[in-house]
């Protein structure tokens, strides 16, 4: 049985290798035919390009390593003769290029789709692409800032009634000048609610979702007024009628998010359910038979936007433990601070559909790092995020690459 399986696998591996070899042979003929066409051309002779032997060149293509011959020419300029390879120019192959432009764009497209380095290497097992090679491709790619790309390439969406803005920070270690430093990534997720056609009972799909981010060192000061002004400007690039819509802003209860109405007059603040429920579970463990009813009552009161009921429950003496009493006091203070901006009482309204920022950060920020302790270069990671966020924002990445690869 084992020999039969081995024979089956070897058969398909052999066929796969034959296909790649055929493609490489065909590509070699194309390249060398182009070179011969230039060699025989009247144009080449009339412009004074003098043949000076042939040289081999090796390129890494999507099919494997391609080695082909092309003619070398001498051409006179004001400083004397210099060597030139006309077929390289005609085929778009740069002087020190090792990997075809086609393969580079394939790799960058995978980066833009959220693939990690190992995923990309696994896509091309026959090429043995290293992490350094992928990093070098990203590093050499010229990219505008995410904001500039959005301004140039975004198609505006018409808003109906609500625009949801989910905001949160996450912190990552990135390298700058070969030193690890902690950076804050402030992620902003925009959407217009759930897509009723695509959503299922067990999986909600956001409609017209767009994403933006700010990247700064952890200890750098953010001017909240400027931040919200930038968020509003980005929202107006993504959507029409932003000033007339109801803006539903959700977050973890940080003071700068709670006070959004100071900077965005037509906005409403709602505390992210995830953070409140997590705090309740940590203090009133639902797996504890004594605490489970308390947890359920608090949870129900929270979902109903009943702030007074929550305070009433939390005002009772539940614990003899000093540490837990301190946490209980902190929880009451957290509730009070959020209710100052109606973050609790707004839970009961129909427009409260929850907040998706935690999963957004997990899927689009931490996933790209691989959830490990690795530290990317800040420059490289910013380019990775820019490419990925552009894809999430429905921007045609291939068009973006064409602009960057055509000189």
Where are the predicted features?
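Catalytic center-proximal scaffold of phosphoryl-transfer enzymes
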Residues: 1-29, 75-407
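Basic, low-complexity segments
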Residues: 24-99
